[in-house]
Amino acid sequence: GARPVGLHGASSGVVAGVKRPPRVVSGGGPDPIDFGLVGDITGFDEALLGLLLGAGHVPVLACLAADASGQALNVNADIVANQVASALGAAHLVLVTSTPGVLRDVKDPASRLRTLTVAQAKAAIADGTVTGGMIPKLEESIGALADGRVGAIHIVGDVGVGDLVREIETAGAVGTALMA
């Protein structure tokens, strides 16, 4: 099987970024918020990631980026995953979360939506079906699908042996599959 290689994104510039500038945020009052050492991604070392993948390794990235001076910056895990998948043209991206997928009712795991198109995901956000932390997760995923380089994004929860393979082989088998 595949062999994982743990890296943090700032290692050898695997993930490049810039410090997020202060800005006014919804619900944060009128003054700009300084995000500290939070960064926004500007690029990846696709050659290094490709080399690792080509050698049968699976890069496991801790969500840090490095700016031009080498300063480590914290970046959102979903953003890193979606942008790496897009940069590499991944056929599938699996996001593991605390719920078994996108739920119609966050209190009812049986309300899992098995598949969603981008249009359906946007509608579910707009009509309030999707709430909380699932909104930015879907928004980032929609962005990754928009360029056409990622085939499908699978959002899954607690998975057992063989579940990831089942989800990839049958979209929505154990989670929610988001497709263009």
Where are these regions (language model features)?
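C-terminal catalytic "cap/lid" subdomain
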Residues: G1-A180
